[in-house]
UniProtKB/Swiss-Prot annotation:
It comes from Streptococcus pneumoniae (strain P1031). SUPFAM superfamilies: Ribosome recycling factor, RRF (SSF55194). This is Ribosome-recycling factor. It comes from the Bacteria. The keyword Cytoplasm applies. Belongs to the RRF family. The keyword Protein biosynthesis applies. One of its GO terms (cellular component) is cytoplasm. Signal peptide: none annotated. It is found in: Cytoplasm. InterPro entries: Ribosome_recyc_fac (IPR002661), Ribosome_recyc_fac_dom (IPR023584), RRF_sf (IPR036191). Responsible for the release of ribosomes from messenger RNA at the termination of protein biosynthesis. May increase the efficiency of translation by recycling ribosomes from one round of translation to another. Keywords: Cytoplasm, Protein biosynthesis.
Length: 185
């Protein structure tokens, strides 16, 4: 029973790490990265479809994304979706592919993005602490129901805290790495 609580908490904390990694992937660092387009959805035959399902996204140069639609008739729809997005760059349509040039980041933009990274990292740590609270509550319920002893409860609480500390440290490391990547010129 006690191990089930810890395993469930670990699994949920891992999901928080994965979610954070996805969010960080969407924050650009002045280099082309296919994950910048992960949140773009295109109206394709009346259905909102993720861009990566209707086109291949390649990186021919350090700051250029090349979007090649599988169906050439969707080119205008893709261009419309890219123009409507908040990427801050204009797509260039040459009739068969769309080129997106990722602009170089200004110092001010870098600092703003670093603040955003800190905020996202802080939110991930709050989520991990909420998971810890849920696990602690579950352990206390088991102790109240006499499923575990008071000593087992104390041990379980220490184990949950250790898992939480490890998860928070991992988030701090991820945040620091992303900040460093953003502030690199």
């Amino acid at each position: 029973m006690a191990n089930a609580i810890i395993e469930k908490a670990k699994e949920r904390m891992t999901q928080s790490h994965q979610s954070l990694a996805r969010e960080f992937g969407g924050i650009r660092a002045g280099r082309a990265n296919a994950s910048l387009l992960d949140r773009i959805h295109v109206e394709y035959y009346g259905v909102e479809t993720p861009l990566n399902q209707i086109a291949s996204i390649t990186i021919p140069e350090a700051r250029v994304l090349l979007v090649t639609p599988f169906d050439k008739s969707s080119l205008k729809d893709i261009e419309r979706a890219l123009n409507a997005s908040d990427l801050g760059n204009t797509p260039a349509n040459d009739g068969s592919v769309i080129r997106l040039v990722v602009p170089a980041l200004t110092e001010e933009t870098r600092r703003d993005l670093a603040k955003e990274v800190k905020k996202v990292g802080e939110n991930a740590k709050v989520a991990v602490r909420n998971i810890r609270r849920d696990a602690m509550d579950e352990a206390k319920k088991q102790e109240k129901a006499k499923e575990i002893t008071e000593d087992e409860l104390k041990t379980l609480e220490k184990d949950i805290q250790k898992v939480t500390d490890d998860a928070v440290k991992h988030i701090d490391d991820m945040t620091a790495n992303k900040e460093k990547e953003l502030l690199e010129v």
